[in-house]
Amino acid sequence: MEKSRIIIALDYPNEEQALSLVRQLDPAQCRLKVGKELFTRAGPSLVKRLAAQGFPIFLDLKFHDIPHTVARACLAAADLGVWMLNIHALGGLSMMKAAQEALANHPSHPQLIAVTVLTSMDQAALSQIGLAGTPEDNVLQLALLTQEAGLDGIVCSGQEAPALRQTLGKEFLLVTPGIRPAGAAPKDQQRVLTPREALAKGANYLVIGRPITAAPDPMMALRAIEAEISNV
């Protein structure tokens, strides 16, 4: 069975609630994302536990620091057995290269991707922090820098995926948050698409949180999304 393209964001405030969902899942059904809140509360032991159960883990901590510090943090993450981790492209070329080189010989070979422009930021928000151009302009510039650094891909909005796929080639991973099934409210992410739309535009993986984790029946929500994307 092909590994799932759905990454479930474990947006829970504690380990017990996260594990309550995980116990309903099979590693062949999905991948799991552990972010800042859950990692800070539950620690590396939870990541190790989930990885040991066979779940591909995306550790979403968005490292952004001087090159040496980020490189060491990436190695520490890889030692937890994660499938994927991320860093901030705004940390620059040297920082990204240091992270990539640190992981190059790690036995687990985790996927290293970069965050470009946060999906909560529209053009007005970018202007407020001094970045000229549209979100798409900034995403493309940072994506090219990420590829130059030798990373495996980026986190991006599905709306930018067609242009990125054309520019960066078919092997470059596009991991897309801001996914809401048809009819769901967009919440705090501005550049949103349905799962089907995002894959059709070139995304490789879909990060989906509240539409599954906050659903009355999370497994029913997951199955509905799987049905929606089954022929894309």
Curated annotation (Swiss-Prot):
One of its GO terms (biological process) is 'de novo' UMP biosynthetic process. Substrate binds at residues 11, 33, 60-69, 119, 180, 189, 209-210. This is Orotidine 5'-phosphate decarboxylase. Signal peptide: none annotated. GO terms for cellular component: cytosol. InterPro entries: Aldolase_TIM, OMPdecase, OMPdecase_AS, OMPdecase_bac, OMPdeCOase_dom, RibuloseP-bd_barrel. Its EC number is 4.1.1.23. The keyword Lyase applies. Keywords: Decarboxylase, Lyase, Pyrimidine biosynthesis. PROSITE patterns: OMPDECASE. The gene is pyrF. It catalyses: orotidine 5'-phosphate + H(+) = UMP + CO2. It comes from the Bacteria. Catalyzes the decarboxylation of orotidine 5'-monophosphate (OMP) to uridine 5'-monophosphate (UMP). Homodimer. Belongs to the OMP decarboxylase family. Type 1 subfamily. One of its GO terms (molecular function) is orotidine-5'-phosphate decarboxylase activity. Pathway: Pyrimidine metabolism; UMP biosynthesis via de novo pathway; UMP from orotate: step 2/2. The active site is at K62 (proton donor).
